[in-house]
Amino acid sequence: MITDLGDKKLTTENDDYWIAPDANIIGSVHLSRDASVWFNCTLRGDNEPIVIGEGSNVQDGSIIHTDPGFKCTVGKFVTIGPVSYTHLTLPTTPYV
């Protein structure tokens, strides 16, 4: 489910991304090229923006949430493994 919160909404660079049908994208979330959000994930950009970098994937059951004043940026080609809870910025190519 994609939920806009006023002017906070999902943005993308193009159509080269994938969101599982039961994932929750809330507020200010940006998906870069070839990014993917898998089953039962929740990305809550209600406080600050979340940016998922090129080729990165957020795997099943993971949650990304922001705190006021702290956006979350996931770099290029990052894998956030299943059932992870993330509040932080991740550089390019790590596995969480």
Protein language model regions, located:
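Single conserved hydrophobic/aromatic residue that forms the stacking wall/gate
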Residues: 87-96
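Glycine-rich nucleotide phosphate-binding loop and flanking beta-alpha elements
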Residues: 25, 64, 94
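A structural motif detector for beta-strand N-caps
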Residues: 11, 15-19, 23, 29, ...
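Residues that scaffold the ATP/ADP-binding catalytic core of kinase and kinase-like folds
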Residues: 61, 67, 96
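N-terminal charged helix/coil linker that caps or initiates catalytic domains
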Residues: 2-9
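Right-handed parallel beta-helix/beta-solenoid
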Residues: 46-47, 67-69
